[in-house]
């Protein structure tokens, strides 16, 4: 039987160095099979199970039914200059497009460099079903975030979902009295993540990566307007056609079903 001292050393190296069983075995002079058995017993046999910040095993959770908790956040994307940006073109071509766009809009920074601006994407996702709602806005002020929340709550209500709680980070909009009052008016309990622990809101952070790969950076856009126009179609694909591993390879929309005939609420 493996001693407690050896087990602690194995776990310590796993947390600090994020090494595999063979590498840990080489460092500590124990069989790789023993290392693997210890990692499995401690539920850290996969690196994806370990929090990158704390080194502790991830504590995953899912609320029991739609609306029990929604996650909200804001992610930002640089606007696209007329003709496209440097991500798909050369840097020089992208720079010329920025110059032309700034000349048309008159938007320049204090040092006269072209300023294209930022799109603030307000996102809302249901914890249980992963059903997603999003709006592109020009800022992340409290009044804007509250407007998005109201419309998202109404959107979910149209699909038979009553929102009970909302989880956000500690951004200025979400810690404001206005946000608290709006939640009270909507009969929603506001909750916030622990400071410096964005992984607490990990579901929506993961959604942002999916959204970036599937929509924002998926193809060449000639302008910000063209990218914005593509968002509703991508959201429909995400909600209705993209299988989700955490949902047993079902879709978010299929998870939101009525008790009658097992028909998705979205299509009634």
Regions found by a protein language model. Give the residues of each.
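Basic, flexible linker segments flanking DNA-binding modules
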Residues: 1-91, 172, 181-182, 195-200, ...
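C-terminal domain-tail junction helix/linker
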Residues: 59, 67-68, 186-188, 209-268
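Two-metal-ion RNase H-like nuclease active-site motif
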Residues: 66-78, 95-111
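Active-site beta-loop-alpha junctions of metal-dependent nucleic acid enzymes
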Residues: 99-121, 135-160
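Short, acidic, Ser/Thr-enriched surface-loop or helix-capping motifs
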Residues: 126-127
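Acidic/histidine-rich, metal-coordinating catalytic segments
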Residues: 140, 158-176, 194-196, 249-253
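RNase H-like polynucleotidyl transferase catalytic core
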Residues: 165-170, 184-203, 219-224
């Amino acid at each position: 039987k493996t001693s407690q001292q050896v087990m602690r050393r194995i776990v310590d190296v796993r947390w600090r160095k994020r090494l595999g069983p063979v590498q840990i075995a080489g460092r500590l002079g124990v069989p790789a099979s023993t290392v693997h058995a210890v990692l499995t017993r401690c539920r850290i046999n996969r690196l994806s199970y370990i929090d990158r910040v704390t080194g502790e095993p991830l504590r995953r959770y899912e609320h029991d039914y739609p609306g029990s908790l929604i996650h909200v956040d804001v992610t930002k994307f640089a606007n696209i200059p007329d003709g496209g940006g440097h991500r798909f073109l050369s840097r020089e071509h992208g720079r010329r497009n920025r110059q032309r766009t700034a000349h048309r809009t008159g938007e320049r920074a204090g040092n006269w460099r072209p300023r294209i601006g930022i799109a603030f994407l307000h996102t809302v996702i249901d914890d249980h079903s992963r059903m997603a709602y999003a709006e592109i806005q020009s800022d992340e002020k409290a009044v804007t975030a509250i407007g998005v929340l109201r419309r998202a709550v109404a959107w979910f209500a149209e699909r038979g979902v009553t929102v009970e709680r909302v989880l956000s980070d500690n951004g200025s909009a979400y810690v404001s009295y206005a946000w608290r009052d709006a939640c009270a008016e909507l009969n929603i309990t506001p909750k916030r993540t622990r400071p410096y622990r964005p992984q607490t809101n990990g579901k929506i952070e993961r959604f942002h990566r999916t959204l970036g790969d599937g929509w924002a950076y998926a193809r060449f856009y000639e302008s910000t307007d063209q990218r914005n126009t593509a968002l509703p179609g991508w959201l429909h694909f995400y909600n209705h056609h993209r299988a989700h591993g955490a949902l047993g390879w079902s879709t978010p929309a299929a998870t939101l079903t009525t008790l009658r005939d097992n028909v998705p609420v979205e299509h009634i």
